[in-house]
Design a protein with these regions (language model features):
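N-terminal secretory signal peptides that target proteins for export/translocation
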Residues: 1-19
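Bacterial N-terminal signal peptides
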Residues: 20-35
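N-terminal mature-domain "stem" immediately C-terminal to a signal peptide or N-terminal signal-anchor/transmembrane
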Residues: 42-138, 340-352, 357-364
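Auxiliary, metal-adjacent structural segments of Zn-dependent hydrolase domains
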Residues: 182-238
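Active-site recognition of the HExxH zinc-binding catalytic motif
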Residues: 254-274
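Post-HEXXH active-site segment of zinc metalloproteases
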Residues: 270-297
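Pan-zinc metallopeptidase signature
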Residues: 315-398
Length: 398
């Protein structure tokens, strides 16, 4: 419905290849498995190039704006003006619907309203608000499509079903009060300008083959689709396929980091027995339990498995970024990001990078052994984290 730009990475190979030629990647086998991309897939070949597609989306902007329309202070920091514009136009019933959405998905479910709904709606082709409302009224097609992905959760779907009446009312409220016209006038032109600014540089980064070399399996596509949004801040959100949502204001480096990061969710097959056992074992570690329990739930990562996945991806993001010369100051970043909760990412980064310098191997294989052998648990984990964030290390990094 809205214009998009497709670009291909044809150059810009990263320096310092750790693996040399791309390794033989893990075959998904003859069974009907769920790939980490979220799509059910059979065997696939590794990719050699990266296509970049940049798009605006009224659909995802509408779903992201639901965060702020509930009056959630966490999002009003970013969208007070939009809240002030629409809030007086809503009826009491509509205002209650926005708050009910937040209560069910965020307060009770421990999720993020925008991330949850964007993921679910990414499995259907809706683009306009009337289409989105129709799916909220009858979500059978969404359910059938979502069941075919690795993102399906019985509990998550039950929460969505509970939230559906409020979602329908909230979306109808946005439609009734003129959100589509508001978006086209205030958001779309800004997004189109930003797409034109980003387009020359993204093709320099051929990220897909490099990511695959660490994950050990092919991504679902060589096309990375970036939806630039006006109302997604402060999140970067992965949806099904090799697609993600990022904010129009983010500088180039953050957009690139978002692309690297979100393309790796999830970085392993969590349903494989060895990986499942390793995740369960690490989930019981006292440091992991403490970080999940004692952080602002608005950040997300409210379960041990979700926290482990996120920190795995953050560590891999740093390693991949170093290959392209666009890495962050890792110590400073993890000291500040989400209140400093991602200490596991720091430990994974240190230990996996050390292992790669000796015997290059796929992340899944390394992770399972690191957890089972105690390199990523207990006193050893505590020591790695303490040394990484020590005053001496911080001084050396400056």
């Amino acid at each position: 419905m809205y214009g998009d730009t497709l670009l291909r990475s044809q150059f810009g190979k990263p320096s310092g290849l750790l693996f040399g030629p791309l390794p033989c990647l893990l075959c998904l086998g003859c069974f009907c498995l769920v790939s980490p991309s979220g799509l059910r897939a059979g065997p696939a070949e590794p990719h050699t190039s990266t296509d970049w597609r940049l798009k605006p989306s009224l659909k995802y902007d509408a779903l992201c704006l639901l965060n702020a329309m509930s009056g959630d202070p966490y999002y009003l920091r970013y969208y007070q003006a939009e809240y002030d514009h629409f809030h007086p136009l809503f009826t009491p019933e509509e205002l209650a619907a926005f708050q009910t959405l937040k209560h069910i998905i965020k307060d009770e479910g421990g999720g993020i309203v925008s991330a949850t709904l964007a993921l679910y709606y990414s499995v259907v082709d809706d683009e306009t608000l009337p289409e989105i409302i129709r799916t909220a009224r009858d979500s059978s097609a969404m359910e059938a499509a979502l069941r075919k992905t690795s993102y399906w959760s019985n509990e998550g779907w039950r929460n969505y079903e509970r939230a559906k009446p409020a979602l329908q009312t909230a979306l109808q409220a946005l439609n009734r009060t003129g959100f589509p016209a508001y978006w086209k006038q205030t958001a779309q032109p800004r997004i189109e300008r930003r797409i034109a600014q980003l387009s020359p540089d993204l093709p320099k980064y051929n990220i897909v083959p490099v990511i695959e070399s660490y994950l050990g399996f092919p991504l679902p596509s060589q096309t990375v689709t970036v939806y630039l949004l006006a109302y997604s801040e402060p999140h970067g959100i992965r949806i099904t396929g090799l697609r993600f949502l990022t904010h129009v204001s983010y500088p180039f480096q953050i957009v690139l980091h978002n692309a690297i990061h979100e393309s790796m969710h999830p970085p392993y097959h969590a349903d494989e027995p060895a990986m499942r056992q390793a995740i369960d074992l690490l989930s019981r570690d006292s440091l992991i339990v403490d970080k999940v329990k004692r952080h602002d739930p608005a950040f997300g990562y409210n379960t041990p498995s979700g926290y482990i996945e996120e920190d795995s991806v953050q560590a891999l993001e740093q390693i991949v970024s170093e290959r392209f010369g666009v890495e962050r100051d890792a110590r400073k970043y993890w000291q500040q990001q989400d209140g400093g909760m991602h200490v596991l990412a720091a430990a994974i980064y240190v230990e996996y990078k050390r292992s790669l310098s000796q015997v290059p191997q796929e992340y899944t294989k390394w992770f399972v052994h690191a957890v089972e052998d105690g390199y990523l648990r207990g006193d050893r984990l505590q020591t790695i984290v303490k040394e990484f964030f020590s005053e001496e290390s911080l001084r050396e990094a400056k």
